[in-house]
From Swiss-Prot:
GO terms for biological process: proteolysis. The lineage of its organism: Bacteria, Bacillati, Bacillota, Bacilli, Bacillales. GO terms for cellular component: cytoplasm. Its main location: cytoplasm. Binds 2 manganese ions per subunit. Keywords: Aminopeptidase, Cytoplasm, Hydrolase, Manganese, Metal-binding, Protease. It comes from Staphylococcus carnosus (strain TM300). Gene3D superfamilies: Leucine Aminopeptidase, subunit E, domain 1, Zn peptidases. SUPFAM superfamilies: Macro domain-like, Zn-dependent exopeptidases. One of its GO terms (molecular function) is metalloaminopeptidase activity. HAMAP family: Cytosol_peptidase_M17. The active site is at K273, R347. It holds the Pfam family Peptidase_M17_N. Mn(2+) 1 binds at D266, D343, E345. This is Probable cytosol aminopeptidase.
Length: 495
C-alpha cells in the first residue's frame, strides 16, 4: 500500500515533518496551536516575510526550531477560502502529496484542523484527504521486470475526532475501490480475457457480502443472450456475463442497477480499427472496472442499500466465426438487431446487459461505457456525456455531486429522432449503427431502448475513462471516473 494513516489525539510527533495549510487570510481560520505554540502567529510572520506562500497548491518548506519544537514545517497554500471547493481542495492535496513524494519524505504529521474552514468542514476534509492520497499516489508496475519498491508514505493525522477518523477510513475505502478499477483496467489484454476477468472478479469478492454469478459462452447462447454471444464469438476466449448482487437492505427494497461495458479488447472486428485506433483498446473495459470499484466501496462501507451489478465482457476479434456487417442476431428481449458496423459492439453487449439488469426490477439503471468517439468530440477528453430516458432518472443529483468532485458530466439529448433511427432497418427490429451525425446520441438511444420504462442514465465515459497525462487524480492511465461521485450519490440516497 502506498500510504498508511494513523491518528493521534495528543500532540506527539511521529516524524520531523509537520504539514499545515495556509490560506490567504489567516483570520478566516480558528487559532491553530500545536504543543503550546501559536501556529497562527508563526504562519502569519513567515507569510509576511515571504518565507511561505498561500497561493493555491503552492508548497513551501522551512525549518522551525523553538522552545523544544524542532520540525521541518511544510505549508500548502489554500488561496482565498471563499473560492475553495471540493475539487480545488483535492488539487491542493495532490500538490502536497506529490511534493512529499518528490522530496522522498516517507513520514509526516498533518494538522487536520488547518485545512478546515467555513467552506469545507473538517469531516469532509478528512475524507477527501485520505481519498486523494489513495488516488494521487496510485502506482502500477505488475508487469515490469524491475520491481522497485514503490513510494510509501506514513501520515499521522492530528486533531481528528471520532467522526473524522471514520471519515478518513471511509475515504480510504472509496480510494481502494478506485484502485481496484485501475488495477483491472491496467491488466494487458492477452492476460485479461473475459474468462480471466470473470475468475478474478469471483475470487476478489469471495467471502464478502457480494455474490457473483458467471454465465459462460455456452450458457449465454442457450439462454438467449444473442448480442453478447455475437460480439464474443469471434474470439477463442468466449464472452462472459458477470452478475454481482449486494444485499445491504431489506429484500423488498428495489436495488440500484450498475451496468458496465467490459470489452477486454476491441479490434473493431471486421469493421476493423486502424493501427493507431487499436492502441489502448484494452481500456474498452473501463466501464465495467468502474462498476466493480463502486460495488467494492459500497459493500466495504456496508451501505444499507441493494445493488445489482452487471458486466458484459467479451473480446471483439476476427475469425471465421466472428459477426459480420449485415448479420442479424436476436437480443435477450426477443428483438432482432441488424449489425451494420462490428465496431459498434459496445451497445450490443450493453443491450443484453441492460435488459438482464431490468429483470431485477431496479429503481434505476446506471450504465457506464467507453462507447463513442463522438462523445469525446462533443465534450473533450475530460468530460463524460450523460443521457436520461425519462424525468425520473436522477440526473440533476448525480451531475451536481460529480461537478463538486471535479468529475464533469454534461447531458446530451436523446430525442424521437434517435429513437426512430435505431429502428431504421429493412430486415430487423433494430439496427446498431448510423452513418449520419449524432452517433453518441444514437448509441445512447440504442442502449436505453432495452431498459423499458425503468429510469436509466447512460454515461459515455470514452473521454475521461483514461488520461494521457498526470493530473490531480493520479498518474496517466485509467482514472476510475465517477466511482467517487456515484458512491457519494448512493450515500446521499440513503440519507
Amino acid at each position: 500500500m502506498p500510504i498508511q494513516i494513523t491518528f493521534d489525539e495528543q500532540d506527539e510527533l511521529a516524524s520531523d515533518v509537520l504539514v499545515v495549510a495556509l490560506p490567504d487570510h489567516l483570520n478566516q481560520l480558528s487559532t491553530l496551536t500545536f504543543q503550546g505554540h501559536n501556529l497562527t502567529e508563526l504562519l502569519d510572520t513567515y507569510k509576511q516575510h515571504h518565507i511561505i506562500s498561500s497561493e493555491v497548491g503552492k508548497v513551501s518548506s522551512t525549518r522551525f526550531n523553538e522552545n523544544g519544537l524542532d520540525v521541518r514545517l511544510i505549508t500548502v497554500g489554500l488561496g482565498n477560502l471563499k473560492e475553495l471547493n471540493r475539487a480545488r481542495t483535492m488539487e491542493v492535496f495532490e500538490k502536497l502529496l506529490q511534493t512529499l513524494k518528490g522530496n522522498h519524505i516517507t513520514s509526516a504529521d498533518v494538522l487536520l484542523q488547518s485545512f478546515a474552514s467555513k467552506a469545507i468542514e473538517k469531516i469532509e476534509i478528512a475524507e477527501l484527504f485520505s481519498l486523494q492520497a489513495k488516488k494521487a499516489l496510485y502506482h502500477f508496475n505488475n508487469y515490469k521486470a524491475d520491481k522497485r519498491v514503490p513510494y510509501h508514505l506514513n501520515l499521522k493525522i492530528h486533531g481528528a475526532e471520532a467522526d473524522e477518523v471514520t471519515a478518513i477510513k471511509d475515504g480510504e475505502i472509496i480510494g481502494e475501490g478506485i484502485k481496484l478499477a485501475r488495477d483491472f483496467s491496467n491488466i494487458p489484454p492477452n492476460i485479461l480475457t473475459p474468462e480471466y476477468f470473470a475468475d478474478m472478479i469471483s475470487a476478489h469478492f469471495e467471502e464478502t457480502s457480494v455474490e457473483v454469478e458467471v454465465k459462460d459462452a455456452e450458457t449465454l447462447q442457450a439462454e438467449g443472450f444473442g448480442l453478447i454471444h455475437a460480439v464474443g464469438k469471434g474470439s477463442e476466449f468466449g464472452p462472459r456475463l458477470i452478475t454481482l448482487t449486494y444485499q445491504g437492505a431489506d429484500d423488498d427494497s428495489a436495488p440500484i442497477a450498475l451496468v458496465g461495458k467490459g470489452i477486454t479488447y476491441d479490434s473493431g472486428g471486421y469493421s476493423i480499427k486502424s493501427k493507431l485506433g487499436m492502441q489502448e483498446m484494452k481500456f474498452d473495459m473501463c466501464g465495467s472496472a468502474n462498476v466493480l470499484g463502486m460495488i467494492e466501496a459500497a459493500h466495504r462501507l456496508a451501505l444499507p442499500i441493494n445493488i445489482v451489478g452487471v458486466i458484459a465482457s467479451a473480446e471483439n476479434m476476427i475469425n471465421g466465426e466472428a459477426m459480420k456487417p449485415d448479420d442479424v442476431f436476436t437480443a435477450l428481449n426477443g428483438e432482432t438487431v441488424e449489425v451494420l458496423n462490428t465496431d459498434a459492439e459496445g451497445r450490443l453487449v450493453l443491450g443484453d446487459a441492460v435488459f438482464h439488469a431490468s429483470q431485477y426490477q431496479p429503481s434505476v439503471i446506471l450504465d457506464f461505457a467507453t462507447l463513442t468517439g463522438a462523445a469525446v468530440a462533443a465534450l473533450g477528453e475530460d468530460k463524460a456525456a450523460v443521457f436520461k430516458n425519462n424525468s425520473d432518472a436522477p440526473l440533476e443529483e448525480i451531475t451536481k455531486i460529480a461537478g463538486e468532485n471535479g468529475e464533469w458530466t454534461f447531458e446530451l439529448p436523446v430525442t424521437e429522432t434517435e429513437k426512430h433511427l435505431i429502428k431504421k432497418s429493412e430486415v430487423a427490429d433494430l439496427v446498431n449503427h448510423t452513418n449520419g451525425m449524432g452517433k453518441a446520441l444514437f448509441a445512447a438511444a440504442f442502449v436505453m431502448h432495452f431498459s423499458g420504462n425503468i429510469p436509466q442514465l447512460h454515461f459515455d465515459i470514452a473521454g475521461p475513462a483514461t488520461t494521457n497525462r498526470n493530473n490531480f487524480n493520479g498518474p496517466k492511465g485509467p482514472t476510475g471516473y465517477l466511482i467517487q461521485s456515484i458512491v457519494d450519490w448512493l450515500r446521499q440516497e440513503i440519507k
